[in-house]
Amino acid sequence: MADDMSESQQPQWRQRAVTRGLATAHARAEDRIADLVRAAWELIDERGTVEFTVQDVVARSGQSVRVFYQCFSGKDELLLALLEDSIREQAGDLQAVVDRETEPLARLRAYTMRLYEWSQPSGQPGSHEYRPLAEFAVQLANVDPTHVEASFEPVSQLLLRLLDDAVAAGALRVTNTERAAGLLKQLVMYSWNRNRYIKDPEQRISAEEIWDFCIHGFGADPPR
């Protein structure tokens, strides 16, 4: 029967029609996802928080609730998608900043300072408000640390390479670079999360203080 024909036995016109139909459906799905993602970013940028509902996203995007749940299992999955996209962007930006330096410690410092800056409101036209997503990542890490760690993989691997390079160059005395990378990331994330609740700017932990603390803890004499 016709339905039992293998793909190679099907008429060319049928294969072309199926391919065209799949391509159209794929493009339509991509457009719907883009609408939902755009709407979520707009809400985050306007409100400075991820405290909005699926219905808010649906209303802003012009899509339906049915379409939303065809694309995402819920709000958390949508936020995780935004987080993963922002981390990929962040990894590229961190690499570009690091590549401006040549010395191992200077490269590691550039990474640390930039990682801290990413948690701050940029105030630049066209840029997104990333801090609410960073806060979401901290909260999600308490219930799903494996998924969050996987999302941060591009950023984590870059840091690990920088630490390995610094150790190989004799600039750091670290026996376990994976643990050192985890300590540095956690210190940065905890510090800017803590800073949210401190009204006096003088009492907030700065990126420079984090760097000084880490570099001495890792057994290095920072360049003067």
Where are these regions (language model features)?
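N-terminal intrinsically disordered/low-complexity leader segments
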Residues: 1-31, 222-224
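Generic hydrophobic, amphipathic alpha-helix propensity
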Residues: 29-40, 57, 82-86, 90, ...
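Helix-turn-helix
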Residues: 35, 43-77, 81, 85
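An amphipathic alpha-helix signature
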Residues: 37, 109, 113, 156, ...
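Hydrophobic alpha-helical connector segments
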Residues: 81, 95-125, 181-184
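Amphipathic alpha-helical packing segments from all-alpha helical-bundle domains
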Residues: 88-91, 139-168, 178-182, 193, ...
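Amphipathic C-terminal alpha-helical segment
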Residues: 117-121, 161-165, 169, 181-201, ...
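Amphipathic alpha-helical segments used for helix-helix packing
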Residues: 119-143
